[in-house]
């Protein structure tokens, strides 16, 4: 089975710090269109449209992993609330955080690559990963540029944008992944 790494911020979810809210009415109206969670009155985090069906598809067809530039505590909250709590049978095999992004940038200085998948098999010698079976889904162009053949790009998701509740990006990506699997 192939491996897929998922980015969190602006790929699967969008988080807005409460301290940045200037129009509380609009903020609440926008959030009402989404599955959202309040993280300790610090962040309001909204799941991207079609997140759960997309995750169902991924967990059925891939070994699922996370690679995020977020801190461990923040990422753990998102993983628990948006991924695992919705379906306790889901299993995430490996989670990489901000620390791993810093290591990647240090190792791949010339490319400034914060999530270089190659590290898994060349530096860390993890035998279940290789360039033929390991991919990442991310919204950052830098991630795509550093591994063109192993990255599936998505448009960044921002729930405060008008019409963001109609976002179809995860369903589009599901079709792309389906073609890639076959």
From Swiss-Prot:
The keyword Hydrolase applies. InterPro entries: FCP1_dom (IPR004274), HAD-like_sf (IPR036412), HAD_sf (IPR023214), TIM50 (IPR050365). SUPFAM superfamilies: HAD-like. SMART domains: CPDc. PROSITE patterns: FCP1. Residues 1-180 form the FCP1 homology domain. The keyword Hydrolase applies. It is an enzyme of class 3 (hydrolase). Keywords: Hydrolase, Protein phosphatase. Pfam families: NIF (PF03031). One of its GO terms (molecular function) is phosphoprotein phosphatase activity. Transmembrane segments: none annotated. May function as a phosphatase. PANTHER family: DULLARD PROTEIN PHOSPHATASE. This is Putative CTD phosphatase-like protein 355R. The lineage of its organism: Viruses, Varidnaviria, Bamfordvirae, Nucleocytoviricota, Megaviricetes.
């Amino acid at each position: 089975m192939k491996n897929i790494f998922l980015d969190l911020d602006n790929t699967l979810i969008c988080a807005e710090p409460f301290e940045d809210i200037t129009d509380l009415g609009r903020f609440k109206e926008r959030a009402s269109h989404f599955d959202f969670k309040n993280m300790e009155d610090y962040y309001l985090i909204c799941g991207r449209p079609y997140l759960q069906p997309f995750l169902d598809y991924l967990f059925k067809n891939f070994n699922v992993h996370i690679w995020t530039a977020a801190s461990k505590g923040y990422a753990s909250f998102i993983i628990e609330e948006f991924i695992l709590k919705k379906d306790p049978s889901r299993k995430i095999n490996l989670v990489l955080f901000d620390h791993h992004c810093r290591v990647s940038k240090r190792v791949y200085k010339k490319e400034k690559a914060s999530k270089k998948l190659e590290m898994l098999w060349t530096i860390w010698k993890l035998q279940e990963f290789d360039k033929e079976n390991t991919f990442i889904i991310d919204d950052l162009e830098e991630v795509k540029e550093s591994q063109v053949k192993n990255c599936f790009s998505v448009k960044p998701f921002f729930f405060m944008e008008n019409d963001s509740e109609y976002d179809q990006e995860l369903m589009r990506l599901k079709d792309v992944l389906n073609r890639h699997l076959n």
